[in-house]
Design a protein with these regions (language model features):
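Hydrophobic alpha-helical segments and their boundary regions
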Residues: 19, 32, 43, 71, ...
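Bergerat-fold GHKL ATPase/HATPase_c domain
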Residues: 1-41
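Conserved beta-strand-loop-beta-strand hairpin that lines the nucleotide-binding pocket
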Residues: 1-5, 47-132
Length: 132
């Protein structure tokens, strides 16, 4: 496992930086165009949620190698208010804002591995992985 890049997310322009960084690393490990699009879309949704609901935070990208298998793991960490009901938040249609409620559940479906840890007042940590 190699830490590749850290990006602070504090403004909407930082979401674009996350998208570009994820795409760049996905290309480097030769993910298919479809898999590149999936992880970039998931990362964009999660960075957007982190900014809107968590007040911003930090994104870390890691290139993974396990034997002959390569992957890209992206961590999202914020110190926001946390998510009181994770199961409810992962349901399609759930939103606490003006969005369509597809962010967390949609992001989960786009990646091979998805982990979410959160508690009220403790912030949120989401980790996604896409394998080649």
């Amino acid at each position: 496992m190699l830490k590749v890049e850290k990006i602070s997310v504090a403004a909407s322009g930082d979401i674009v930086a996350v998208r570009h960084a994820v795409r760049r690393q996905a290309v480097k490990i030769n993910l298919s165009l479809v898999d590149q699009t999936k992880i970039v879309t998931a990362a964009s949704e999660l960075a957007r949620n982190m900014l809107i609901y968590g007040g911003g935070g930090e994104v870390t990208l890691e290139v993974l190698q396990e034997g002959v298998r390569h992957g890209l793991r992206v961590h999202f960490v914020d110190d926001g208010p946390g998510i009181p009901n994770i199961d409810l938040a992962l349901r399609d249609g759930f939103t606490t804002g003006n969005g369509m409620g597809l962010g967390l559940g949609g992001a989960k479906r786009l990646v091979n591995e998805f982990n979410l840890e959160s508690a009220p007042g403790k912030g949120t940590r989401v980790t996604i992985t896409r394998w080649k």
